[in-house]
Amino acid sequence: MSLPDFTMRSLLDAGAHFGHQSHRWNPKMEPFIFGTRNNIHIIDLAQTVPLLHQALKAVSDTVARGGRVLFVGTKRQAQDAIADAAHRSAQYYINSRWLGGMLTNWKTISASIQRLRKVEETLQGGGSGLTKKERLMMSRERDKLEKALGGIKEMGGIPDLIFVIDTNKEQLAIKEAERLHIPVAAILDTNCNPDGITFPIPGNDDAGRAIALYCDLIARAALDGIARGQGAGGVDFGEADQPPAEDLPAADLPAETPEPTTAVTEAYEAPAEAFELLTAPRGAPDDLGKLPGIGPQIVKKLNDAGLYHFWQIAAMTPEDAAKTDHDLKLGGRIERDGWVNVARSLVAA
């Protein structure tokens, strides 16, 4: 894989160049403003393109070193895109509300995460010994904790880089990251303050299409980092169960027929390797912790059950996934967190 490609045209089509009304601006953003049209500031995308590329490279390098990226976007327009991008790239996210101390008071946050796990285990076990009211109260507690901490419950520590949509709304997250010297990549609209942002990306932080584009690019950069990390770790793609997928430039694709795309889709839907459990790993086991929502305890549970490699999970049919989830009492994690799709991306990387 390689860093995701994008063009100024793709940014224009997404509306990334539209800023806020000219009277709602932060003077510190003046260097990134191209001009004004109908009292709306226009962002200079000629600067956005290289700055966005720098941010993508930083994300890829961070993940390639084994680092963790935290996606942060709690505004309504960003919530779904943030969660989807984090799931697809096996990273972490906050899309509900930033709780004070999420980074600077990780010890307390970890205690809340442990409580969430304990509640989940109790409810997955049927809640025996609890009254109906106690089960209801526990379910509500689980839902509340899951909403606040579900995106980071498997993070295992503070992230190595955070990606932020809307620095005005996420000021607390940025201040905590700055205090801990965590690099920040952030989308900066014309009403934002670029101070303290390690990798500034001038762009519209309100339009849904623009937010979706940013998140997709960051997610793909993280997947590139995962692939590079596997290569640096000695993964021999020549001996892989499935060959890595290569992205062909548009000019190299057939002009009319979509057959190659269809073939790739079918390959994903019906992988060559059939799903099977192993008595021992074939060579070095994969780092299953790269799958979303997986921590050391779940990795051990999967290994004990005979799951060591991404290709095994990628080969799962819906029936295989449901049976494995039931047998290991995973509480619907395989389907909910998209393990199969992420595993297929990692196998193809």
UniProtKB/Swiss-Prot annotation:
Q: What would be an example GO MF term here?
A: structural constituent of ribosome
Superkingdom: Bacteria
**Which cellular component, as a GO term, is one annotated location?**
cytosolic small ribosomal subunit
What is one Gene Ontology biological process annotated in the Swiss-Prot or TrEMBL record?
translation
Q: What Gene3D superfamilies does the entry give?
A: 5' to 3' exonuclease, C-terminal subdomain (1.10.150.20), Glucose-6-phosphate isomerase like protein, domain 1 (3.40.50.10490), Helix hairpin bin (1.10.287.610)
Provide the alphabetized UniProt keywords: Ribonucleoprotein, Ribosomal protein
The record, for PROSITE patterns, names: RIBOSOMAL_S2_1, RIBOSOMAL_S2_2
Q: Which InterPro entries match?
A: Ribosomal_uS2, Ribosomal_uS2_bac/mit/plastid, Ribosomal_uS2_CS, Ribosomal_uS2_flav_dom_sf
Family indicated by similarity = Belongs to the universal ribosomal protein uS2 family.
User: Could you identify this protein by its name?
Assistant: Small ribosomal subunit protein uS2
Tell me the lineage of the source organism.
Answer: Bacteria, Pseudomonadati, Pseudomonadota, Alphaproteobacteria, Hyphomicrobiales
